[in-house]
Amino acid sequence: MEDDGQSSVAETLDPALQKKHHDMLERLSARHQARKSDSPDSSSSSSSTLESTSSFLAKFSDSKRSIESRIAESRLASSSTDSSKLKSDLAEISVAIDNLEKLLAENSYFLPSYEVRSSLKIVSDLKQSLDILSGELVPKKKFSFKSKSTTKKPESKLPEIQKPDVVLPPKLVPVRDSPGLRNKHGETLVKSFEGSSIGEFTLSDLDSCQVKLTGTVNALFLHRLKKCSVYTGPVIGSILIDDVEDCVLVLASHQIRIHCARKSDFYLRVRSRPIIEDSNGVRFAPYCLDYKGIDEDLKTAGLEEETNNWANVDDFRWLRAVQSPNWSLLPEEERVSLLTISGDS
């Protein structure tokens, strides 16, 4: 997912994070172009996907081993390490785990589903190992006079250690300076990207609005939307969504990541499996938008084929074998069959 929760945070964001986010989008766009150029030869495309999967697994495994090693080293060095240094080490490990989860999210669109689930389990296990370590080490130094506090204090300490995991997902912060529609209430907002060179576009702080976007754009960011209906043409790269409630969103993209969504319906066409985090009451159905020129826009974005991935949702906060209770398929009798919009009204 990727925006901040407060305006003041956006103004003080480390420029390095902005560059990292931009580079991520460039990589996604480059991957898309590579897939398009390879598509005429199915065998070549299959080989490329296999190569990409192998490359990801190698990088993921290296990072996993590094994190496991750092956890083990921190445990061994705890007796000779001062409290402030220990906290710093644990925080760095937490950031490394978050970066590993981000790596998985960025590459999930071409990975086999079993690799995604296996990798999610690994990330979850690493987080649990860090939680246990922080519970064993940090409370001992601060609360050594309570011998039984070791098993109870991790919960009070976890928010500090896990802070990157809470703060980092809303990374829409870097795009606050990008073109967009912001701070509107009860309006119909229309924008056409036809003939435009806009790379990124943001919808932020909208309440009870209807938004119609036609044409293609490289990346789309949605942040703090309430009681809105959003209809968009295809997005070449990714769509990152944070903090939406009581909304209907009709979206097409290669990757869609949803963070903190509540009681909202998503009509999607997406090349990879949609990802939800910290969300509940969200329902999914197939993309149903129509406007003049949409077929050409879908081809331009490499989204002309329906993959049915709209129904294959990954809940990053639900790793059990049973269906996540946080999302469901929108019943057919409740779905909108077709929505027709225009770029000028």
Swiss-Prot record:
Tissue specificity as recorded in UniProt: Ubiquitously expressed (at protein level). Present in leaves, roots, flowers, and stems.
Low complexity composition-biased segments: 40-55, 74-83
Name used for this protein in its record: Tubulin-folding cofactor C
Residue(s) carrying N-acetylmethionine: 1
Organism: Arabidopsis thaliana (Mouse-ear cress)
Family in the record: Belongs to the TBCC family.
Function summary: Essential tubulin-folding protein involved in the final step of the tubulin folding pathway. Required for continuous microtubule cytoskeleton organization, mitotic division, cytokinesis, and to couple cell cycle progression to cell division in embryos and endosperms. Not essential for cell viability. Binds probably to the multimeric supercomplex, stimulating GTP hydrolysis by the bound beta-tubulin and the release of the alpha-/beta-tubulin heterodimer.
Observed effect of gene inactivation: Disturbed microtubule organization. Lethal embryos that consist of one or a few grossly enlarged cells that lack microtubules but not actin filaments. Failure to localize KNOLLE in mitotic cells. Cortical microtubules-free interphase cells and mitotic nuclei missing spindles. Reduced trichome size with fewer branches.
MF GO annotations: tubulin binding
InterPro entries: C-CAP_CF_C-like, CAP/MinC_C, CARP_motif, TBCC, TBCC_N, TBCC_N_sf, Tubulin-bd_cofactor_C_dom
Region named Disordered: 1-83
GO cellular component, one term: cytoplasm
UniProt biased composition (Polar residues): 1-10
Assembly: Supercomplex made of cofactors A to E. Cofactors A and D function by capturing and stabilizing tubulin in a quasi-native conformation. Cofactor E binds to the cofactor D-tubulin complex; interaction with cofactor C then causes the release of tubulin polypeptides that are committed to the native state.
PANTHER family from the UniProt entry: TUBULIN FOLDING COFACTOR C, TUBULIN-SPECIFIC CHAPERONE C
Regions that span the bilayer: none
GO biological process: microtubule cytoskeleton organization; post-chaperonin tubulin folding pathway; tubulin complex assembly
Boundaries of every C-CAP/cofactor C-like domain copy: 169-318
Subcellular location: Cytoplasm
Top-rank taxon: Eukaryota
Miscellaneous: Belongs to the PILZ group of genes that disrupt, when mutated, the microtubule cytoskeleton and produce mushroom-shaped ('pilz' in German) embryos.
Chain's gene name: TFCC
